[in-house]
């Protein structure tokens, strides 16, 4: 809703010029679609591993661009093609463990005890996504700051200076790690550096979490089924759903 209101409300800088924006912020958008449909699809395509676009995300309003990046950084709401449940599953394990500690009950999920080993793996998996993204951004920023001749040799990367240039690099690696594919196209990314580094980011961001998630499944599969008792933490309640949402919001968002 914030994304839609931003785009339909128009650009305040253009308002200051006295230019009417009856159709909203139309920069980078197709007239046949308009600002509302473009804003809606920018959210739909980034909340899943879709990546198709019907407008230029780099031209959207600041809050819209933030929401697009946040969707991919959380990488859990609706899940990606083929691995949709797996990231959500990781946060369920964390939520079960934290909930159990909070209420003094044994952390269990699907009749299997969730213990320290599962929690350690789930924590590593949850931290991998931001680590892979920020590692790529750190490398590109280091090269841009200390090896400008290398950047110039690739035709230059940033067509927008300062903080938005950083956002373009952050979006690029976020999109790759989330297996999305959309981009802030003010970034000159069709170079050897960007193609290789985002390729590796995609591979690591896709397969390393799967290794951890399958390891958790293997550990749980090897444990005996524990019948439900009065001390079992129920995972089919609204309360646990809210708890899982809180864990996703706090851990994935940060």
Report residues per predicted region.
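Helical transmembrane-bundle signal
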Residues: 48, 130-133, 137
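Transmembrane helix-loop junctions in multipass membrane proteins, especially transporters and channels
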Residues: 5-10, 104, 108, 141-149, ...
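P-loop potassium selectivity filter motif centered on the GYG triad
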Residues: 8-83, 151-205
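Non-catalytic terminal/interface segments that mediate subunit docking, oligomerization
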Residues: 58-85, 97, 101, 107, ...
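Short alpha-helix boundary/capping motifs
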Residues: 126, 138-139
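C-terminal transmembrane helix pair
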Residues: 89-105, 113-131, 170, 177, ...
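Acidic/polar loop patches that form or flank catalytic/metal-binding clefts of enzymes
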Residues: 4-6, 121-122
